[in-house]
Amino acid sequence: MARESHFSSKKARVFVRAIRGDYSLKEELARLRSMPRIVKGRELLFNDGPQAFSKHFIEPADGMTQTLHIHLEEYAPGGRTQKHGHVNEAAFYILDGEGYEIHDGIRYDWKAGDVAIVHMNCVHQHFNAATKPARALVLKSKPMIMFMNLLFQKTVIPRPTEPTPEGKGFAPRHLEENLNHPD
């Protein structure tokens, strides 16, 4: 008799691992209170590219929060991100532009004002379907996932290394007075 797959099994499970470590609430509160309370977005630069750029305001490595990872994504006209999957959930608030996501092979269209939700363990990719840039503010629970030692992230298709034809010469809007894309 073959063993039942853990992937499709409905067997009862406990999904919490024991979390151990030296921890002083007093010391942790003092450390958190010593961290900056304002992140100057204008002092941060976009990285990655040439089709998808990221500006990280709060990252797990900063230690500024225990539960949040917040970054801004800007997609060049016709641009796309890497295809990847990760354990942590993510919410993309679409600031401007229009595009779509592919989540586990299913397409979801979005435009400014929408929120795109990426569920845990979903293989996904983000696409800008327009000839203008698109921008999204991204909120993730990545630090909490890392704390619980549940982090898993895998790239399926890497980021493009060449710009799209319509995105040649594109640079993210870093220091514009009006961060909304003019019509």
Language-model features: where?
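Conserved short histidine dyad/triad with adjacent acidic residue
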Residues: 54-58, 70-85
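A short, N-terminal "cap"/entry segment at the start of jelly-roll beta-barrel domains
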Residues: 1-66, 152-183
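Glycine- and acidic-residue-biased ligand/ion/polar-headgroup-sensing regions
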Residues: 77, 88-99, 104
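A short hydrophobic beta-strand segment most commonly corresponding to one strand
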Residues: 67-70, 91-93, 117, 132-150
